[in-house]
Amino acid sequence: MRTKIIAILLFANLTTSLNAQNHDKVGLLEKPVPVSSVKNITGFFGHRMEVNRDAYLKHFPIEKYVDFVVNRQHTAWDWTQAEQHGKWIESAYLSAVQSGDQELLAKAEAVLNRIIGSQEESGYVGATAKSFRSPERPVRGMDTYELYFVFHAFITVYEETGDKKALAAAEKLADYFLQYFGPGKLEFWPSKLRAPENKQKHLDGQSEFAGHSVHYSWEGTLLCDPVTRLYELTGKKKYLDWSQWVVSNIDKWSGWDAFSRLDSVADGTLGVDKLQPYVHSHTFHMNFMGFLRLYRITGDKSLLRKVAGAWDDIHERQMYITGGVSVAEHYEHDYVKPLSGNIVETCATMSWMQLTQQLLELTGESKYADAMERLMINHVFAAQDCENGVCRYHTAPNGSKPDGYFHGPDCCTASGHRIISMLPTFIYAEKGKEFYVNQYMPSQYNGKDFAFSITGNYPESENMELVIESEKAKNKTINLRIPSWCENPKVSVNGEAVADIKPGTYLKLSRKWGKGDKINIIFPMEEKWISRSHHSKYISYRLPGGEVMYKEEPADKIPYAFVRGPIVYSLDMVWNKQLCNDDVDMEQDMRMNVTSKPTAINKPRKDMLGPVYQAKALYKGSEVDVVLTPFANIGQWFRPDGVKPQKNADAFTYAIWLYKAE
C-alpha cells in the first residue's frame, strides 16, 4: 500500500502542480519543481531537516490537537492550539513526500482524514464551538488566522498527491466564509467603529472577525491568499470575486488607506511602517502573497508594484544581517533594528521566505534568491533546537540560551517546522527548457527527463560540482544563480572555464547535457569584519495593547560582525569554555581585535555548520582567543561534553555584533 501511495505522489507531482497556472493571466518565470523530485539533501541542512522530520514532526502530539479541533468546544481568544493541525499536516506531507518517509506519510494521511471527517456540513472545520457560532457570529476572532493554514494544508496535499477530498474540503471551507462574508454581509472590521468614524483611529483589543484590532483588519483579510489559490486551481469565479472584494475594502476597514498607500511605499516616499500605527510583519506578508496571486490571475501590475515596493523597503531598512526580519513582530521606523530582545519572529521568517519565493517566481530576479539564501543559511536553523527540533519564538542576533527554545506549542513552533519542511521547494525551478539552480544545497534532482546531483557541502565549502545523471541527453539551459556577494565566481563545464560571469545574475549554460557532464562551481568567500550601519541605542515602550515599540538615541560606539561570504558568525559561549564564564556580558566585557584576521580551526562537532574560526579579543581587559561559529549553530544550547542546563535558563550568551578593542 505504501509503495502505491508513493507512486501516486510521484505521478501527481507531474500533473496536479501544472493545473495551478491554468487560470492565471501572468505565468511564472520560474516554476518550482515538485518536492518529490528533490532527494538526498545532505550536509548541515539535510541533517537539520532530518531533525525536523524525525525528532519533531514524528513525535509531536498531533493527536491532542486534532482532538481539540474535532471536539470543537473552543470559545476563548487563544489561537495557539487551533493552528497546530493545519501547519502540521502541510509540514508532514511535504517532509514525507520529499524524503519518501512512508511512516510519516501514513500518519499524515490519518490526521488529514480525521480532520476532513470532522468537517461540518456547513464547511466549518475549525475549533470553535457550535454553540458559540451563529449567522451573526459565524467565527471567532482568530478563526481567520487559524484556518488560513488549514486552507493551505488542504491545497498543498491536493497539489502534491492529487487527493481530491483535500481540495473538496478546502472548497467547502471557502464556501463557509463566502456564505457569511461578502457584499451586503459581514465584513472584517477590526473594531466596532465603522467608516468614516474609524478614519485614522488608533486601535487596541480584539475584533469579532479580524483578529487583533491593532492589525487594522489585515488579520482577517489575509484569507485573500488561500482563496485566490483555490481560484487558480478550480477556476471558480466566486473565489476570485470574493478575494477582490476583500482586498478592495482594506482601505475602508483599516481606516488608514493602508492598501492604497502601498503605492507611496513603492514610490520611495513612505516607509512600510507608516501605513498604519502598527504594521505586523507576518500578517502583512500573508496578505502580500494574496496580492501577488491576484496579480497573477488578473494581470494588474499595480499589485505587483505595491508588493515589490514594500519588499524593497523592508529589505533595505528592516532586514537584519542574517536575512531575518521583524522587530517585536512588526516593522519599525527608519533603520531601527535592536540587537536583543524579541527580535526576528519565526512566523515572520516563514512568511518572509514564502513571499520572497513568490516574487522570485514572478520576476526571475536573482536578488530574491540571494535574500532567501542569507535567511536560510543564517537564521532559519538558528531558531531550531539542534536536538529536538523545536523552534524559538524570537531569535535575536545577540542573546542567551536555552531560554526561548522550549515553549509552546504555539504559532512560532509550528511556523518553524513548516518553513523547514518547505525549504526543498525553494532549491530548484524550471520553465520549459530552462532550469534554475537557486540554492546550492548538496542534493539530487530527479525530474521526468532530467537529473543531476550537486556535491561539495556548500556553504561550508566554496567548491561545488554539478554532475548530470540523466540517462538520455537533453537540451537544456541551466541557469546558475551567481550570488551578488561573490566578486570572483568561477564556473567550468567539463573542465572548460566559462567567461563573463556576473554576480547578482543567472549564468546561462545552454547545451545538450549528457550523463556524466560536469559543472564545477567556485564561489570564493571573503572573510572580513564589518561595522554595523545605522546603529543606535534603542529604547522600548509599549502601545496601549502591550505591543513593544522602539525609540532611538545616538550610540557612542559601533559594533562589528565577522562574516565569510553569506555566512554570519557569532561568539557563542557554548564553544568558549576557556573563558570560565558561560554568561559573559558581551556588551560590557568583550572587545574584539577586528584588525587581526581570524584563523580557521577544526569544527568541534561534525554535524555543525562550518568553518569555525579562532579570533583575538580582550575579555575584561585581558588578551584571549575566542571561537567564532556560524550563527546557524546557536541551536546547540548545551555543551556536548557537559551537563545540560535547565531549559528555561539563560545559561549561555551569544552575540553576532561585538564592540572592537580600542
Residue ranges: model-predicted function:
Residues N22-Q102, A106, P135-E160, H202-S213, ...:
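Aromatic (Trp/Tyr) and acidic
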Residues S95, A108-V111, I115, V157, ...:
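Alpha-helical solenoid scaffolds that mediate protein-protein interactions
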Residues W88, Q102-P138, A168, Q318-S326:
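Helix-terminus loop motifs that line ligand-binding clefts
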Residues I116-E120, G162, L178-P183, G235, ...:
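Helix-capping and short linker residues that terminate individual alpha-solenoid repeat units
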Residues S243, V307, A369-N378, A383-V467, ...:
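C-terminal beta-rich recognition modules with glycine/proline-rich loops and embedded aromatic residues
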Residues M1-N22:
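Bacterial Sec-dependent N-terminal signal peptides
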Residues C486-S510, W529-K537:
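Solvent-exposed beta-strand/loop surfaces of large extracellular or lumenal domains
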Residues K476-N479, V491, L509-P524:
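C-terminal beta-strand-rich structural cap/linker in extracellular carbohydrate-active enzymes
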